[in-house]
């Protein structure tokens, strides 16, 4: 399934992701990885310029290990890099960005930024080395996509995170944690926002 198919099938605006060929896109899932019904998996299948950063242990995440994999993935890219992160993947990005060489990073698209300081340890999850959440300006452009009924972060907290990171906060409405349970499929609206984000990187008008 290519970009053109997605545009026709879902009637998405013309700016969807037509400039994606200028970038390497790294997909960063959260705790337990993104399954077959997750929008990240759909995107990875649909676009050849997107690839997932695979972690050795998805169930007991260790920041040092995840950061090492991310650094290696970025080093292997030939084009400017876009990071597409979900949930714990957003905490990986914000911490990694403060210590890594980020010159290759063109921007980050951060979906469902988990409030790890409040939720670490719940449901049996442990995030070794990810907390506390880093609330410093990111050295690259970023958008935060936040849901108003995300069980892992209050909307106002997500908006405060975006402000601390120097990122734009996009109100996604009532989509829960925006994972597999939200049943977003290929998530056409998410692709629209991602396309607008890419357009904004080039200083273009991002209105559909």
Describe these PLM feature segments.
Residues 180-194:
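Post-His helix in hydrolase/transferase enzymes
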Residues 95-106:
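Conserved hydrolase catalytic core segment
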Residues 19-79, 203:
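Active-site catalytic motif of lipid deacylating hydrolases and related acyltransferases
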Residues 84-93:
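Gly/Ala-rich beta-loop-alpha elbow adjacent to hydrolase catalytic centers
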Residues 138, 144-146, 150:
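Short beta-strand/loop motif that positions the catalytic acidic residue
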Residues 30, 55-58, 109-118:
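Active-site nucleophile loop of the alpha/beta-hydrolase fold
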Residues 151-157:
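Conserved alpha/beta-hydrolase "acid-adjacent" motif
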Residues 49-51, 163-179:
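Catalytic histidine neighborhood in serine/cysteine hydrolases
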């Amino acid at each position: 399934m290519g970009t053109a198919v997605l545009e026709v099938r879902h009637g998405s605006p013309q700016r969807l992701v037509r400039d994606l060929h200028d970038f390497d896109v790294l997909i960063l899932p959260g705790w337990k990885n993104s399954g077959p019904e997750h929008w990240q998996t759909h995107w990875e299948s649909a676009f050849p310029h997107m690839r997932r950063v695979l972690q050795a242990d998805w169930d007991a995440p260790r920041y040092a290990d995840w950061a090492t994999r991310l650094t290696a993935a970025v080093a292997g890219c030939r084009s400017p890099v876009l990071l597409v992160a979900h949930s714990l993947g957003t905490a990986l990005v914000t911490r990694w960005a403060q210590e890594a060489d980020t010159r290759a990073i063109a921007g980050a698209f951060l979906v469902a930024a988990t409030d790890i300081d409040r939720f670490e340890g719940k449901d049996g999850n442990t995030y070794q080395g990810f907390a506390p959440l880093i609330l410093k300006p990111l050295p690259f452009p970023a958008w935060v996509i936040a849901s108003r009924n995300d069980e892992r972060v209050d909307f106002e907290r997500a908006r405060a995170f975006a402000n601390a990171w120097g990122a734009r906060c996009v109100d996604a409405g009532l989509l829960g944690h925006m994972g597999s349970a939200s049943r977003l499929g290929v998530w056409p609206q998410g692709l629209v926002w991602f396309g607008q984000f890419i357009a904004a990187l080039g200083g273009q008008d991002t209105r559909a």
